[in-house]
UniProtKB/Swiss-Prot annotation:
Its job: Minor protein of the capsid that localizes along the inner surface of the virion, within the central cavities beneath the L1 pentamers. Plays a role in capsid stabilization through interaction with the major capsid protein L1. Once the virion enters the host cell, L2 escorts the genomic DNA into the nucleus by promoting escape from the endosomal compartments and traffic through the host Golgi network.
Short motif (Nuclear localization signal): ranges: 1-9, 439-447
SS bond list: C18-C24
Main location: virion
An example Gene Ontology biological process: symbiont entry into host cell
Source taxon at top rank: Viruses
Gene name per UniProt: L2
Pfam families reported for this sequence: Late_protein_L2
Protein name per the record: Minor capsid protein L2
Amino acid sequence: MALKRRKRASATDLYRTCKQSGTCPPDVVPKVEGDTLADRILKWASLGVFFGGLGIGTGSGTGGRTGYVPIGTRPPTVVDIGPVSRPPVVIDPVGAADPSIVTLVEESSVIEAGATVPTFSGSGGFNVTSSSTTTPAVLDITPSGGSVQVSSTSFINPLFTEPSIIEPPQAGDLAGHVISSTPTAGSHSFEEIPMHTFATSEGPGSSTPLPGIRRLARPRLNLYSKANQQIKVANPTFMSDPASLITYDNPIFDPEETIIFEHPSIYTPPDPDFLDIVSLHRPALTSRQGTVRFSRLGQRATLRTRSGRRIGARVHFYHDISPIPSDAVELQPLVPSSSPSITYDIYADPEVLDLPAQHTQPTLTVQGPSLSAASASTKVHNVTVPLATGLDTPVTSGPDVDFAHAPAPVPAVPYVPATHPHSIYIQGSDFYLLPAYVFFPKRRKRVPYSFSDGFVAAW
């Protein structure tokens, strides 16, 4: 079996490990240190040939430090920009006779402002003189005479004035008394829009309200889901005191809230339908199958794991409060009923006609379909109508009328045509077997049949 040749490590990896111990292969050290035969030829050739700044050799091929320069041009020079020099600050020379204290404010003359303090001479004090006037001071503001004419002019610019407050200035006299005024000028060009109150949030109706989004969306209760066990409770105590059906004690609870029960390990509830119930959710009123239904969702704790987790099914307990009867609507016929159905006798009744015995005919009653469309509740009446035949009609001849032949009586039976529009088969079938295939062996497939058409008649 041929062994697979392993690839040797790179020269760089071998050089790192074998350089210190001196066990490197003969081709590793010259390759890493650049001392191969090709490198030596380039070194020897560079001594006699100068390639300038082209960088031809074992370099990176970037054209040297200055890069590649077109023929006939010079490489660009780099101008070094030094720091910007600041102008010198002139410093005043300080001599030995100058003071060492520098004054911040120059000397100036002192200016005194303010009123002078009065000086009093003598010791007599002040003389106070008091006087009183009994006549009130009344000023007459009414003009002495002459009529006052007041005129006003207003210029309204709708571009700078709001339409709802366009009012002319009120006219008044010089004394301030109003003479005339107008309430408004022109008609208002605005529309009153009634304000609507948006939906406001109401306080929660219970101590454990649902979150905001779920409360507004009104989620479905899913009482009749396949995951819920349906149990009907016939005891009406389920609506007022459901805890009495689960435990014997009487805990203080709110019937509108969720009830949580703590049971011992072994116990028997008063109602066996509420076995292993640990919680009853808030009640709900629904209408289903024509009744008002009181429902509560319960949670069972049938199993309990070692970690303390309880496992059980959800149960829907419901109690039907009262039925909802359907409204009875009396239906009226759309088409008014006409005359009742009447059955007529074709031949006359001898008792009604009171004819001689030799001309009496046997009475034939033909009950056909009703002559009018009536409702099913209409009462059927049988009425005999006297109809005379040709024998009952007296025929006499006179000077002006000649009855050579008596008129033929109207037949009682409807006229039936002698020919029929459809074909009638008497003791026949709807197809015939071709006689040529009678003596052939029977086959289940490919047996031609010829129907009773022109082909059979011609054959």
